[in-house]
Amino acid sequence: VNDPALSMTCEWWKQLFGESEGKEDKGLLPMDTCYSEDLHSLGQFVQDGSPILFETFLSLRDSGSSYVLHPDDVNDGFSYVDGKDFSEINKAAYDATLSAHSKRFPCLIMEMDRMDEETFGSLFYFFQFACYVSCNITGVNPFDQNGVEDYKRDMFRLLGK
């Protein structure tokens, strides 16, 4: 994601796909990154590591907020962003990241106008349906969680439950 407003949606998405698909040595490992925050940590792997992934870019066309960086007297090397809105800076980071990453592996793009109730509901429905279809294609039951039950059983035993 390139907008922090979507980060908790990604936490839900990780649980949905990890818990539904991750069975019987099948499924994809879901992870999320919030660009530009994660460009140096996970971005390094994406750019130069093993190309074992595909990436979904999830973004909002209208973040619903605006903040313009005002010039100051500090010579910090960032004067090139003076007068620019954060949304413009985030869009440049998004475009540059998509351009670089799409040279190495497939990138899916999901852009939404805004994050309102209708869009949020549509996004949830889309991912739930996609997860269900994926599980059916790979032949796993999306509704059980045997792997989770293993650690819970051990934890409860260790705690005397």
Regions found by a protein language model. Name each.
Residues V1-K161:
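A SIS-like phosphosugar-recognition module
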